[in-house]
């Protein structure tokens, strides 16, 4: 009879422990129910990108001196620079510049090390196409600036969590009274 009582006590303890675990997990689930949804309705709502966001590369043909620093610092030797040496003025003349964004890893080394600042990162991240050959941008396509998300009236922009914290900090700072 004694082992039977011990078995019932163990069963009761295990039942209470299981009920406590279920109750704890249910409380966690209920605490998450009060939070706002994290997802956004993508085509109609877009979040504003951060200040140092690395999107599509913008290229200014007139500033480029064909030094090929961008090719040397690229971890995958991606930019294709075609140039011709002008013997009468002893300078390189840029003929063609292209980047294949299907291969690009958006590291930003080319932008950082460019001596003439002819390369810059834009906020454009929508580069999807049905054909991967359309991702090979020449100097004309690289020179086009993307349309700003903020200026588009059909798209509602949503600030991400870091931008909300920054704006809240600024509003708190503006309310402080200094003598």
UniProtKB/Swiss-Prot annotation:
State the InterPro entries in the record: 4Fe4S_Fe-S-bd (IPR017896), 4Fe4S_Fe_S_CS (IPR017900), NADH_quinone_OxRdtase_chainI (IPR010226), NDHI (IPR004497)
Keyword annotations for this protein, in alphabetical order, are: 4Fe-4S, Chloroplast, Iron, Iron-sulfur, Membrane, Metal-binding, NAD, NADP, Plastid, Plastoquinone, Quinone, Repeat, Thylakoid, Translocase
Q: Self-association or partners: how does it assemble?
A: NDH is composed of at least 16 different subunits, 5 of which are encoded in the nucleus.
Could you tell me what this protein is called?
NAD(P)H-quinone oxidoreductase subunit I, chloroplastic
Q: Please state what class of enzyme this protein is.
A: translocase
Which PANTHER family is this protein grouped with?
A: NAD(P)H-QUINONE OXIDOREDUCTASE SUBUNIT I, CHLOROPLASTIC
Sum up the protein's function in the record's words: NDH shuttles electrons from NAD(P)H:plastoquinone, via FMN and iron-sulfur (Fe-S) centers, to quinones in the photosynthetic chain and possibly in a chloroplast respiratory chain. The immediate electron acceptor for the enzyme in this species is believed to be plastoquinone. Couples the redox reaction to proton translocation, and thus conserves the redox energy in a proton gradient.
Record-annotated residues binding [4Fe-4S] cluster 2? 74, 104, 107, 110
Report the source organism: Nuphar advena
Keyword flag Iron-sulfur = yes
Cofactors required: [4Fe-4S] cluster
Which reaction does this chain catalyze? a plastoquinone + NADH + (n+1) H(+)(in) = a plastoquinol + NAD(+) + n H(+)(out); a plastoquinone + NADPH + (n+1) H(+)(in) = a plastoquinol + NADP(+) + n H(+)(out)
Which Gene Ontology BP terms does the record give? Answer: photosynthesis, light reaction
């Amino acid at each position: 009879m004694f082992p039977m009582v011990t078995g019932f006590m163990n069963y009761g303890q295990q039942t209470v422990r299981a009920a406590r675990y279920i109750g704890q997990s249910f409380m966690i689930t209920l605490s998450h129910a009060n939070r706002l949804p994290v997802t956004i309705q993508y085509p109609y709502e877009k979040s504003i990108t951060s200040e140092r966001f690395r999107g599509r590369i913008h290229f200014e043909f007139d500033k480029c001196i064909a030094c090929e620093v961008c090719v040397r610092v690229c971890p995958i030797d991606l930019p294709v620079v075609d140039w011709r040496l002008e013997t009468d003025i002893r300078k390189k003349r840029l003929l063609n510049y292209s980047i294949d964004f299907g291969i690009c890893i958006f590291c930003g080394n080319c932008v950082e090390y460019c001596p003439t600042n002819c390369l810059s990162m834009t906020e454009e991240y929508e580069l999807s196409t049905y054909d991967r050959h359309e991702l090979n941008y020449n100097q004309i396509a690289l020179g086009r600036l993307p349309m700003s998300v903020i200026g588009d009236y059909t798209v509602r922009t949503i600030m991400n969590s870091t931008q909300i914290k920054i704006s809240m900090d600024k509003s708190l700072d503006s309310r402080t009274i200094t003598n």
